[in-house]
Amino acid sequence: MLNEIKAKTKERMLKTIQSFHDDMKGVRTGRANASLLDGIVVNIYGGHQKLNQVAGVSAIDNKTLSVKVWDATAIGEVKNAIINANLNLNPVVEGNTIRIVLPDLTQETREKLVKLLHQFSENARVAIRNIRRDVMEEIEEMKKNKEISEDDFHVAKKEIQNITDDNVKKVDDDLSIKEKDILHH
């Protein structure tokens, strides 16, 4: 029973970290990276499609992204979606391809991006601590109902805290790497 709870806790915290990584992907580091456009949704064919479902995105060099639109009639919608994503990008249409030259990051922009990263990391840490709280309540309830012994309760409590600490450290480490990437490129 406790092993099940630990496994479920690890899984929930891993999903939180994956969500944090997804949030971080959308933050520019100063180098062209196809994942920068991952969150863009295109209004097309009477619905909404993710950009990667209507075009291929690749980095040509450190400063340039290429968006190869598969359906030439959709090029305008794709360009508008990129503009409306508020990423401070200026897409240029060249046939079936949209070229995006990434502007250099100013120090002010870098600091804003780092602030945003800190917000994402704090949200992840709060989510991890909330998961810990839920699990702790669950094992306290089990102890109260005599489903587990006092010793098992204390062991489980310590293990859940260790899992929590490991995951918070992972968030902090990943934040530090991304922050250095933004500030030093």
UniProtKB/Swiss-Prot annotation:
GO biological process, one term: cytoplasmic translational termination
Listed Pfam families: RRF
Subcellular location as annotated: Cytoplasm
GO MF term list: ribosomal large subunit binding
GO cellular component assignments: cytosol
Main location: cytoplasm
Top-level lineage group: Bacteria
Keyword Protein biosynthesis attached: yes
Keyword DNA repair: no
Keywords, in A-Z order: Cytoplasm, Protein biosynthesis
NCBIfam families noted in UniProt: frr (TIGR00496)
Function: Responsible for the release of ribosomes from messenger RNA at the termination of protein biosynthesis. May increase the efficiency of translation by recycling ribosomes from one round of translation to another.
Family per similarity comment: Belongs to the RRF family.
HAMAP family: RRF
Name of this chain's protein: Ribosome-recycling factor
Source organism: Wolbachia pipientis subsp. Culex pipiens (strain wPip)
Gene that this sequence comes from: frr
